[in-house]
Amino acid sequence: MAQKPKVDPHVGRLGYLQALVTEFQETQSQDAKEQVLANLANFAYDPSNYEYLRQLQVLDLFLDSLSEENETLVEFAIGGLCNLCPDRANKEHILHAGGVPLIINCLSSPNEETVLSAITTLMHLSPPGRSFLPELTATPVVQCMLRFSLSASARLRNLAQIFLEDFCSPRQVAEARSRQAHSALGIPLPRSVAPRQR
C-alpha cells in the first residue's frame, strides 16, 4: 500500500496534489498507482480543485490512463474524468485532447463501474438537444446503449435508457436497432462488482 506523500503542511492543497502526481509518475508499484489515481479522482469531485488539477495536467494523466491494461487504473481514470467534465473548461480540454474515442472505448470494459462512468462522462460532454458531437452518438455507441438497456443491472439499464432518450434521435435508435439485428455484436455486458472495501 502506498504511503501518503510527504508534503510540507504549509504547501497547501496544490502542493499535496503535486506530490500525488509526482508519486504516480515515479512509482513502479501498481498498487501505489491505483491508490494515487483513486485519490486524484476523489479530488476531482470538488470544483475548488479544478484549476489545480488543470495546472498539474491531471486531465491528461486521466486520459492517458484510459489506455492502461490495468482495469482498476482505467476505472479510477474514467471516474476522475466523470467528476471533472461538468466544468466547461475541463470539458473543452477533454474534447480538444481527443478524449472522446478513449472514453467510448471504456464502454467495452468488463467492469460495470467503468462503463457507468463512461456513459455519464459522454452525457456530460454533450448536453441534451441536437447540438452534440456526432461521434458521441455514432451507431456503435447507440448499439452499445441498446444492449446496456437490456442489462440485468438497474443502474446500467436506466443510464443507457436515459442516454438513448435524451441524447439520441429516434432515427438514430431505429438505425442502430436495424444494424444490430443484422450483425453479430459480441461485446459482453459488463459484470457487476461489489463495492470495494477501503
Curated annotation (Swiss-Prot):
Originating gene: ARMC7
Pfam families: Arm
Subunit organization: Component of the minor spliceosome. Within this complex, interacts with RBM48.
Signal peptide start and end residues: none
Keyword list, A-Z: mRNA processing, mRNA splicing, Phosphoprotein, Repeat, Spliceosome
UniProt-listed SUPFAM superfamilies: ARM repeat
InterPro entries noted in UniProt: ARM-like, ARM-type_fold, Armadillo, ARMC7
ARM repeat start and end residues: 57-99, 100-140
Positions where Phosphoserine occurs in the chain: 169
Gene Ontology cellular component annotations, sorted alphabetically: spliceosomal complex
Protein name as catalogued: Armadillo repeat-containing protein 7
Record-annotated disulphide pairs: none
Function: As a component of the minor spliceosome, involved in the splicing of U12-type introns in pre-mRNAs.
GO biological process: mRNA processing; RNA splicing
